[in-house]
């Protein structure tokens, strides 16, 4: 599913191509591009869920946390998001790319991927897609885009 999402993002969203394609035509195009039908459906559902997140106040209550608040992950989140990725999310909060609200959106979208092994690169793409879909996050999106295309993100030990 991640391959389909990245393809859609790079082809339509990131390249400023107008996405006025009917879902059926888009599905056909993705199938012709070689993606499996199940992955296509899951990716389109994932994007619909992401769009729905920006239209709700579901995560607004999270934004009231203070800058000294620490996110405690559930066991399911720990199982789905490895230590490196959780550390990267914390790093993004510390450098103000993510707010507590956008972090929660990212975590929700990552968990919706239903992947066995989330890579750091996949996480970066999810963060970029979330920030792209949240109004007022243009600066954070630009910062994240720079982090995505650079291999050394300053995570030294």
UniProtKB/Swiss-Prot annotation:
Classification via InterPro entries: Smg
Origin: domain of life: Bacteria
UniProt organism field: Aliivibrio fischeri (strain ATCC 700601 / ES114) (Vibrio fischeri)
Coiled coil: none
Name of the encoding gene: smg
Entry's family note: Belongs to the Smg family.
The protein's name: Protein Smg homolog
